[in-house]
Amino acid sequence: MEPAPLVRPRSYVVRGRKTDAQQRAIAEFWPAFGVDFAGGLLDLDALFGRTAPRTVEIGFGNGENLLALAERHPERDFLGVEVHGAGVGRVFAAMRERGLSNIRVIRHDAVEVFETGLSAGSVAEALLFFPDPWPKARHHRRRLVQPDVVRLLARALAADGVLRLATDWEPYADHMLAVLDAEPVLVNVAGPGAFIPRPEARPVTKFERRGEKLGHSIFDLEYRPLP
């Protein structure tokens, strides 16, 4: 019996325009720091030119979190996966300004990257912060946090790895909690049915500030592989 096909939510809509500066940054930095992903297994040691703990951020948006963490942890490597060109250009421009070299960027669907590009146990930390909540009921199937996707994320985590998530949309937070708690190979660090306190180490980004301005609570989740 063949396995059921993977359910791939189309969790994004490509929008926004790159500024001239962002376009120039992409043209200048893509050869060194961009990854032309075509579906094959990635050689992370070759991409980064070293062996180090790897953090993968899914949908890094304008790159605030990715850049802050890369600057704070030069001993780690950071792989950002984003479909929007404006965010990619902003990250490259900021890398130039800050002198960062420990970031690589893939402009591709994150589900496919985790499915075919990342080997089992290759990721020390996976981050999914403030993904599109798709609040309308008819769009819930487009939410990125779905059982099949969670299994892919769990597979990529190292034995001592960690999956961190955050959202300011309470119904999506409850959905995340239910899906992740149901994954048998992951353990909720806060305990079943619970969220963790906001980690001080997580940089504050515009998405969090916007949520708080709207009066939304912030929900953080943290999962580790089952020992």
UniProtKB/Swiss-Prot annotation:
This is tRNA (guanine-N(7)-)-methyltransferase. The keyword S-adenosyl-L-methionine applies. The active site is at residue 132. GO terms for cellular component: tRNA methyltransferase complex. Keywords: Methyltransferase, S-adenosyl-L-methionine, Transferase, tRNA processing. It is an enzyme of class 2 (transferase). It comes from Leifsonia xyli subsp. xyli (strain CTCB07). Catalyzes the formation of N(7)-methylguanine at position 46 (m7G46) in tRNA. S-adenosyl-L-methionine binds at residues 57, 82, 109, 132. GO terms for molecular function: tRNA (guanine(46)-N7)-methyltransferase activity. Pathway: tRNA modification; N(7)-methylguanine-tRNA biosynthesis. Belongs to the class I-like SAM-binding methyltransferase superfamily. TrmB family. Substrate binds at residues 136, 168, 205-208. The keyword Signal does not apply. Its EC number is 2.1.1.33. It catalyses: guanosine(46) in tRNA + S-adenosyl-L-methionine = N(7)-methylguanosine(46) in tRNA + S-adenosyl-L-homocysteine.
